[in-house]
Amino acid sequence: MKTSVMFMLVFVISLMCSSEAQEVARTYCGRHLADTLADLCFGVEKRSGAQYAPYFWTRQYLGSRGKRGVVDECCFRPCTLDVLLSYCG
């Protein structure tokens, strides 16, 4: 009995750890998207104008993502918090 309890305890702990390690992709739309971005981006230092690359360079390096916005990536399909954080700053 002691072995089965120990096995169950190890199983539950490993299950909890693995679920916390995986980031769940969710959809964020409308007010929920705006509030989530505000919460995530609060305190993220914004870049000054000198740190921005010229327009023709940014279009070249952005590729297809340059044509999509946060709504395309996180409202029309699920996204992770890491994707939302990429829009901060």
From Swiss-Prot:
Keywords of the record: Cleavage on pair of basic residues, Disulfide bond, Hormone, Secreted, Signal
Top-level lineage group: Eukaryota
Subcellular location(s) of the protein: Secreted
Disulfide bond sites: C29-C75, C41-C88, C74-C79
Miscellaneous note of the record: Silk worm has two kinds of PTTH: 4K-PTTH and 22K-PTTH; there are many forms of 4K-PTTH.
Subunit-structure text: Heterodimer of a B chain and an A chain linked by two disulfide bonds.
Functional note: Brain peptide responsible for activation of prothoracic glands to produce ecdysone in insects.
Protein name: Bombyxin B-2
Organism of origin: Bombyx mori
